[in-house]
């Protein structure tokens, strides 16, 4: 694919919308939103969802503090709705080429996931990519020397696990890398294990490609060579899981953005890396681009 065709696929965003609530963790998505807005030539907006008009003035004041502006600033939006995710997406639909950028502060498992319930609900209903700042972006580990400003490293890491679903977002990841001027690295985290004793027998990994992982990423590199020039691939062998493996990789090889593909299963957001994908948001020290998979891959 030539450079002109790649530019046609590049994401275009005029607004970056940050959902706010009453916690400091929601406000902590603002630096990431500003970095995205600077790259896209966009403006940062906020949205808060309340159950009553009586709260509107107080909430607008909160949005003003987050944006360091006046409460009458038109970039501050307040939706009245008992359904937070519906209010956020309704606001996003009214804005010009909007990108939702949110934070999640969940540090423990709730309902089988490491993603907070409100963030999970917003992601579940998204039909376009959403950027999520996880707890290590919101509240960085002081001992992590790889931490940089949001999008401060020109490298995008796209996570795959050997399934068609996980690879469904690679075209979007490549377009984002091109638009942001980042190098694209495709990473798979695999449990180290010996090959099957019998030729043709299935692999039995707990996580990672159910085949030779090095051969798998070599094949991906060949497939995507024209569409993503300069792409490189990495296999991270980790016996514990996807989250710890990716976290160690990012500490040794910093990135500005991580991408993972998501899908819905029975109306519960099920990321294609299973629990490992929720671990990625939870464990990543950089924002995560969550890409909805096409329906045919879910």
What are the roles of these predicted feature ranges?
Residues 93-97, 249-255:
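Glycine-rich phosphate-binding loop signature in dinucleotide/nucleotide-binding domains
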Residues 79-86, 236-245:
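Charged docking surfaces used in two-component/phosphorelay signaling
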Residues 204-215:
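A short acidic, glycine-rich active-site loop
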Residues 103-125, 140, 257-283, 293-298:
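Glycine-rich, Arg-bearing micro-motifs that act as flexible, cationic patches
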Residues 47, 78-80, 85, 92-134:
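Hydrophobic, ordered structural segments
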Residues 2-58, 63, 68, 72, ...:
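Small/aliphatic-rich secondary-structure junction motif
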Residues 138-154:
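Intrinsically disordered, low-complexity Ser/Thr-rich linker and spacer segments
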Residues 36, 87-91, 245, 249:
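CheY-like receiver
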């Amino acid at each position: 694919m030539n450079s002109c065709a790649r530019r046609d696929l590049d994401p275009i965003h005029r607004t970056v919308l940050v959902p706010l609530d009453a916690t400091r963790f929601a406000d902590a998505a603002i630096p990431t939103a500003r970095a995205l807005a600077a790259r896209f030539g966009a403006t940062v907006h906020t949205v808060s969802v309340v159950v009553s008009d009586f709260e509107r003035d107080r909430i607008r004041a909160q949005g003003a503090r987050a944006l360091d502006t006046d409460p009458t600033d038109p970039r501050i939006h307040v939706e009245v709705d008992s359904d937070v995710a519906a209010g956020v997406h309704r606001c996003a639909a009214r804005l010009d080429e909007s990108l939702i950028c949110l934070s999640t502060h969940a540090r423990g498992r709730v309902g089988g996931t490491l993603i907070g319930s409100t963030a999970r609900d917003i992601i579940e209903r998204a039909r376009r990519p959403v950027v999520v700042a996880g707890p290590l972006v919101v509240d960085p580990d002081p001992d992590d020397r790889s931490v940089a400003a949001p999008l401060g490293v020109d490298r995008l890491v796209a996570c795959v696990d050997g399934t068609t679903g996980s690879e469904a977002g690679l075209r979007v990841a490549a377009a984002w890398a091109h638009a942001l001027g980042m190098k694209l690295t495709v990473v798979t985290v695999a449990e180290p294990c010996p090959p099957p004793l019998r030729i043709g027998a299935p692999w039995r990994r707990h996580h990672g490609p159910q085949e030779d992982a090095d051969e798998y990423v070599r094949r991906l590199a060949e497939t995507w060579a024209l569409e993503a020039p300069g792409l490189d691939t990495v296999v991270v062998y980790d016996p514990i899981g996807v989250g710890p493996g990716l976290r160690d990789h990012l500490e040794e090889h910093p990135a500005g953005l991580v991408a993972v593909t998501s899908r819905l299963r029975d109306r519960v957001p099920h990321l294609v890396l299973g629990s490992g994908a929720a671990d990625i948001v939870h464990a990543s020290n950089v924002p995560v681009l969550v890409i909805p998979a096409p329906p045919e891959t879910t």
